[in-house]
Regions:
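CBM-like carbohydrate-recognition segments
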Residues: 21-62, 69-81, 90, 94, ...
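Residue-level signal for well-ordered alpha-helical scaffold segments within enzymatic catalytic domains
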Residues: 8, 67-70, 112, 116, ...
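Bacterial Sec-dependent N-terminal signal peptides
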Residues: 1-21
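Short coil/turn segments at secondary-structure junctions
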Residues: 24, 28, 154-158, 181, ...
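Extended ligand-binding groove/face enriched in aromatic
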Residues: 81-86, 94-211, 322
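Extended ligand-binding clefts on enzyme/binding-domain cores
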Residues: 164-270, 276-287, 299-333, 337
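Aromatic-lined, polymer-binding surfaces characteristic
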Residues: 54-68, 103-118, 163-167, 171-174, ...
Length: 367
């Protein structure tokens, strides 16, 4: 066998891998992440605040904001970055009252946003604002409830609920605190919490019940888990003791999601129910998890790059001429009723969808 032939055999797998990864780079006009990201990010500048119980910046707005920030950073869009920063800086002055209190996963995750601003700007005021939101998730409040104290005594956040939503809310603020400080306590917390949620909630098919007492595979709930694992694996040191367990859970979930991708290329409100409607926010989160998996080599590019491209191409048509994403499930609490999930209203322009679209766009723009 000639030396040239052996070299060719050696190179073929790499050529195939790069060819598959190129599926996430070459998009037709109107579908490029640069175009889609710009449309959705600039719309954010015109939006009013979406307040949690009418008082504080809510988590959907936080994630829309951070998505716009990621896009601006990736696109090197200085105008957008400046305007996003100016909008946020009102929270230090006349809008300070809108800073969330620190008593719930849905509120503490706000801290991830100023920490993201710090990572981009290196302005210490963002660091000082963001870190207490990460720290207070592991600091017992004076009015702690018995079950919250039990979680804390086991080394988990007292805000633990065993809702799959938590695995983005907790993960995002702890990983951002780790990226800012390099203090391993933050990544250790996030990893320990994730392993426990995997052990408690992941089913044999790789998907997750909304909660232990709600045996339904809700799309966006699973989306929070998928995106949370992708975010954590990006930050988790290669030799971390929990990395193998988290990677196992991630790969198991991705395999199941690939199986349940609907003919359109997206996923349903209840993932395993073919008669349920297509839901875009969860679909965008799954797409984000696929993108990161292919880019980082966690997922086989030959198998997953085509599925990822199909998903992105299917997401874009749900963006209307006003740059609002359609078919977004409204905010949803857990309920042990299949019909409850079927009947949830879907909205156009809901921030639950706007943010994850931007995560995808920013991720696809990465070199």
């Amino acid at each position: 066998m000639s030396k040239k032939f052996l070299i060719l055999l050696f190179l073929i797998p790499f050529q195939l891998m790069f060819a598959q990864k190129s599926l996430l780079k070459d998009f037709p006009e109107g579908y490029t992440p640069e175009e889609i990201g710009k449309r959705i990010a600039y719309r954010f500048l015109t939006e009013k605040h979406a307040l949690h119980v009418g008082k504080w910046i809510g988590y959907p707005e936080t994630f829309y904001w951070s998505g716009a920030l990621r896009y601006a950073d990736g696109a090197k869009d200085k105008e957008l970055m400046q305007r996003l920063q100016e909008k946020f800086d009102f929270l230090f002055t006349e809008e300070k009252i809108l800073q969330p209190i620190m008593n719930h996963v849905d509120l503490n995750m706000f801290g991830s946003l100023p920490l993201e601003f710090y990572l981009v700007t290196k302005d210490l005021k963002y660091r000082y604002l963001g870190l207490p939101y990460a720290d207070s998730q592991w600091e017992l409040p004076r009015n702690v409830k018995p079950h919250e104290k039990e979680w804390a005594e086991k080394g988990y956040s007292w805000q633990t609920r065993l809702w799959i939503d938590d695995m983005y809310m907790i993960t995002i603020v702890q990983t951002r605190a780790y990226k800012v400080t390099k203090d391993k306590k933050y990544i250790d917390r996030a990893a320990k919490e994730m392993v426990m949620y995997l052990d408690e909630l992941q089913r044999p098919n790789g998907l997750f019940y909304h909660a232990p007492d709600v045996p339904y595979y809700w799309g966006r709930g699973n989306g929070w888990m998928a995106a949370g694992m992708a975010e954590l694996l990006q930050c988790l040191p290669k030799k971390h003791k929990d990395r193998a367990r988290i990677m196992e859970g991630y790969l198991k979930m991705m395999e199941s999601l690939k199986k349940y991708q609907n003919p359109e290329g997206l996923w349903n409100q209840l993932i395993d129910k073919s008669d349920c409607w297509t839901e875009t926010s969860g679909s965008a989160m799954f797409t984000f998890a696929f993108i990161k998996g292919v880019q980082n080599g966690w997922l086989d590019a030959e198998a997953y790059a085509p599925a990822t491209r199909k998903a992105w191409m299917a997401l874009v048509p749900y963006l209307n001429e006003k740059n609002q994403v359609g078919n977004v499930c409204v905010g949803t609490n857990k309920k042990n009723s299949k019909q409850y999930y079927y009947d949830r209203p879907c909205r156009t322009g809901d921030f639950h969808g706007q943010g994850p679209y931007l995560w995808c766009a920013a991720a696809l723009m990465e070199k």
